[in-house]
């Protein structure tokens, strides 16, 4: 089992999905000086407790890559203080839970994926496009690595704002995982989203196939019903759903 906890995002930080970017916000790697602030934000916005080992790994770059959002327009003593962050880790493609969904050469053991662990923005800086920019930093970084085949993450099933954001960023929803999260003794489903890069995209994921079949059958039923209701109609209109992402 991974020594890092299952990944969470802050639901409310996803409210900025369609907002214009703020020019005073800059993005940089997280460093040891961010430790206290990083711990504080995680405590404030996430429903689970993260161990000290996790934060030490983040700020020291041990098995984790990370980005901080800072507001350079703030007074000097706060201009480099975290207002948002994203943390992620490398996972070997052959050892990942999506190895059946990506194209990669199994003989090349160095081929990897990037898994997003945590993402959050402090309340006073939401609705400014910061969450979107942080995810974009991860995608840009991953796309520049020839051995990387994708970026993936989990999102709790009721977090509609986050789901919309990932779709907008061209992530694909490939699976629904029942009871994935355990929060306050209650289980919650999660969706698995993947951003395919460097030619790793499979022709169609199992979930997309299932969604297509369901939509096809629904369309067929609707068309038959329409024909029976109007015998003068010439030909059936088969309605296909072009968007097979999870909803």
Curated annotation (Swiss-Prot):
Pfam families with a match to the protein in the record: Acetyltransf_1 (PF00583)
Catalysed transformations (reactions): L-lysyl-[protein] + acetyl-CoA = N(6)-acetyl-L-lysyl-[protein] + CoA + H(+)
Keywords: Acyltransferase, Chromatin regulator, Chromosome partition, Meiosis, Transferase
PROSITE patterns on file: GNAT
Record-annotated N-acetyltransferase domain positions: 25-198
EC number: 2.3.1.48
SUPFAM superfamilies: Acyl-CoA N-acyltransferases (Nat) (SSF55729)
Database matches in InterPro entries: Acyl_CoA_acyltransferase, GNAT_dom, NAA60-like
Molecular function via GO: histone acetyltransferase activity; protein-N-terminal amino-acid acetyltransferase activity
One of the protein's GO biological processes: meiotic cell cycle
Record family assignment: Belongs to the acetyltransferase family.
Role description: Histone acetyltransferase that probably regulates acetylation status of histone H3 during meiosis. Histone acetylation may influence recombination and chromosome segregation.
PANTHER family linked to this entry: HISTONE ACETYLTRANSFERASE MCC1, N-ALPHA-ACETYLTRANSFERASE 60
Other facts noted in the record for this chain: The gain-of-function mutant mcc1 (T-DNA tagging) has elongated rosette leaves, increased stem length elongation, early flowering and reduced fertility and seed number due to defects in meiosis.
Record's protein name: Histone acetyltransferase MCC1
Gene giving rise to this polypeptide: MCC1
């Amino acid at each position: 089992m991974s020594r890092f906890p299952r990944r969470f995002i802050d639901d409310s930080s996803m409210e900025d999905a369609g907002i214009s970017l703020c020019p005073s916000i800059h993005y940089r790697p997280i460093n040891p000086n961010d430790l206290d602030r990083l711990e504080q934000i995680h405590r404030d916005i996430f429903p689970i407790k993260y161990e000290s080992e996790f934060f030490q790994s983040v700020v020291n770059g041990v098995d984790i890559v990370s980005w901080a959002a800072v507001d350079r327009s703030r007074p000097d003593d706060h201009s480099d203080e975290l207002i948002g962050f994203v943390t992620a880790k490398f996972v070997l493609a052959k050892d990942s839970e999506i190895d059946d969904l990506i194209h990669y050469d199994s003989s090349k053991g160095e081929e990897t994926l990037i898994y997003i662990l945590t993402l959050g923005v402090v309340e006073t800086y939401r609705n400014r496009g910061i969450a979107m920019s942080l995810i974009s930093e991860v995608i840009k970084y991953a796309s520049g690595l020839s051995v990387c085949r994708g970026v993936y993450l989990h999102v709790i099933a009721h977090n509609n704002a986050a789901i919309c954001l990932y779709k907008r960023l061209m992530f694909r929803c490939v699976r629904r995982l029942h009871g994935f999260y355990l929060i306050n003794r209650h289980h919650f489903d999660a969706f698995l989203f993947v951003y395919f890069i460097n030619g790793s995209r499979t022709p169609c994921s199992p979930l997309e196939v299932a969604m297509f079949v369901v939509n096809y059958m629904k369309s067929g039923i609707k068309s038959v019903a329409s024909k029976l209701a109007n015998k003068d109609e010439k030909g059936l209109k088969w309605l296909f759903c072009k968007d097979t992402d999870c909803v």
